[in-house]
Design a protein with these regions (language model features):
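N-terminal helix-rich module
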Residues: 2-7, 14-20, 34-64, 68, ...
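Residues within membrane-spanning alpha-helices of integral membrane proteins
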Residues: 27-28
Length: 216
């Protein structure tokens, strides 16, 4: 009786993108192409490239914070700061829910967890191209969520913010949301004015997508 030989050829377990993930990737490419971008990771200027890399680290910090503390965490991007308008669309912070004496999260009672960063000079968060769901493309998705005030903030950080949120398991509450930044200029005489794109910066955009599991 012949002994049956089993095929021991290792089977690759690597999985490709799911259909949903592919749709999201295509959506982000559409957004960045509309913005004049030439790549997903800011292949234009060094300022945009470094801004994307540093911001990704803040998103990872917020996600890990949410998991470790079992409390919601948010990445904030300044929309309209009361005392430092020159940092609008450039100041990025990380906040999380406070914990009570038993180590449990106090719902919607936020505290600053990181001083975050300022985007590089002449680099700004793009309200136009950052979307709540990148799979819907430039026109089909709603804007990023907003936080009208930052409770208990020091004077430097008072104002309104855009935000991306992670739940207690580190899952992004707006899966497929895109984060896009680009080069621009703002009139020195009006620091709170909306930045504008200059001719040399039309292709200088970059960004990433926040997947459902919180990774970028």
């Amino acid at each position: 009786m012949k002994k049956i030989q089993r095929d021991r050829t290792p089977v690759s377990r690597n999985q490709g993108f799911t259909l949903v993930e592919m749709i999201v990737v295509i959506g982000v490419m559409s957004i960045l192409m509309t913005a004049g971008a030439i790549g997903l990771n800011g292949l234009g200027g060094k300022g945009v490239s470094s801004g994307v890399v540093t911001t990704e680290m803040l998103f990872a910090e917020a996600r890990n914070l949410a998991i470790v503390r079992s409390a919601r965490a948010r990445v904030l991007i300044a929309k309209d700061l009361t005392n430092t308008p020159g940092e609008n669309l450039r100041r990025i912070l990380v906040i999380s829910e406070k914990l009570d004496d038993d180590g449990k999260a106090i719902k919607s009672d936020w505290e600053l967890s990181s001083r975050g960063m300022l985007l590089p000079d002449k680099v700004f968060f793009s309200q136009e191209f950052s979307k709540r769901d990148a799979a819907e493309g430039v026109d089909g998705s709603g804007p990023i969520d907003e936080m009208p005030t930052l409770p208990n903030a020091k004077a430097l950080y008072e104002g309104s913010y855009f935000y991306y949120e992670f739940n207690t398991e580190g899952i992004c509450t707006s899966p497929g949301a895109s984060f896009v930044i680009g080069s621009g200029v703002r009139e020195s005489s009006s620091p709170s004015a909306k930045p504008r794109i200059i001719a040399s910066g039309k292709k200088d955009f970059g960004g990433f997508v926040i997947w459902r599991n919180g990774s970028t």
